[in-house]
A protein has these predicted regions:
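Residue-level signature of catalytic and energy-coupling elements of molecular machines
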Residues: 25, 81, 96, 118, ...
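Residue-level recognition of specific faces of alpha-helices
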Residues: 38, 52, 62, 68, ...
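Acceptor/aglycone-binding surface of glycosyltransferases and processive sugar-polymer synthases
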Residues: 68-70, 74-84, 101-179, 198-217
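Hydrophobic helical membrane-anchoring modules
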Residues: 178-307
């Protein structure tokens, strides 16, 4: 059995977390039979993250790194690390210490039991705000309803993959990446481990509300075309209702009945205008995804590396 584990950690403005997470990983794996190396991916940080990584690498042979030319986003930074990984066992996790390194031995134990992918599911605790719990559950419920895959609420980008599954994952040509969905989509033998997220060690979250919303839209648009059918069905339903209203208008015209309700007509027109704009927005999102895919630009650019 190959006992080398490669841990891929994307980092954006995590200067003070870099030495902390490395120390925690070192402690977690000290009593195992595995050797490890840590691949940090500096995702265009503007603080001293790259310097902290380089300093760690200069003093530890098992620390390697990639520095991207700008901030390409968490999923693309993960891809950069996965593309460069060479070990038969790869673990991906975040640098903020909310993915506990102490869980790594449990991931490896499940791998030894024959699982190709060991993913983690976050248990809600006091470190997770009510709004985040509610919006996350709403997203996963909607995602599972609309798509052909099922992602458990609380799923995280903290997982172990063997080389077979990682090679399959890297075959995916998606320009906009949603790894939580892609890992489920490729199949293979998978199992989960639950964990309680810790409080962020230092710094602030890099996922703003805007980024989280875009992440959710990417996930749904990547794995489901049901919103397009929803737009078509709604248009068809309103067309039927409009047709059913025509006989009444004809009857009123020939019977001399005055039809009142200008306010309701204006409100109805405004309502339908909103519906039309919403439908155009749904179609526009899918067209935008196709446009991004057709450009075929690289998902990241490397400024410096030590591998």
């Amino acid at each position: 059995m190959n006992n080398l584990v490669e841990i891929v950690i994307p980092a954006h403005n995590e200067e003070y977390n870099i030495p902390v997470i490395y120390s925690a990983i070192n402690k977690a794996l000290a009593k195992t039979n595995y050797t490890f190396k840590v691949l940090f991916v500096d995702d265009g940080s503007t603080d001293g993250t790259l310097h902290a990584i380089q300093d760690l690498s200069n003093h530890n042979d098992n620390v390697i790194y990639i520095s991207l030319s700008r901030n390409f986003g968490h999923q693309n930074a993960l891809k950069a690390g996965l593309d460069a990984s060479s070990a038969d066992i790869v673990i991906m996790m975040d640098a903020d210490m909310q993915h506990p390194p102490s869980l790594i031995p449990a991931l490896l134990k499940s791998h030894e039991e024959g699982f190709d992918v060991v993913y983690t599911v976050r248990k809600d605790n006091e470190h997770i705000s009510f709004i985040k719990k509610y919006t996350a559950n709403m997203f996963y419920s909607l995602m599972n309803y609309l798509s052909e895959i099922e992602i458990e609420p609380g799923s995280a980008d903290f997982r172990l993959m063997n080389r077979k599954t990682l090679d399959a994952l890297l075959l995916m040509p998606d320009q906009e990446i949603f790894y939580r969905g892609l890992v489920k989509w490729i199949g293979f033998k998978q199992t989960k481990i639950e964990y309680e997220p810790q409080a962020r060690h230092t710094g602030v979250t890099k996922y703003s509300t805007k980024k989280m919303l875009r992440f959710a839209i990417t996930g749904i648009a990547t794995f489901s075309n049901k919103p397009l059918y929803f737009a078509a069905y709604m248009g068809f339903a309103f067309a039927i209702l409009s047709v059913l209203y025509i006989p009444y208008i004809i009857y009123a015209f020939y019977s001399g009945t005055e039809v009142h309700g200008w306010a309701s007509i204006v409100a109805t027109l405004a309502f339908f205008g909103g519906i039309i704009l919403m439908m155009l927005g749904i179609v526009g999102i899918y067209l935008g995804k196709l446009f991004e895919q057709s450009k075929n630009r690289p998902q990241y650019l490397v400024k410096a590396a030590k591998l």
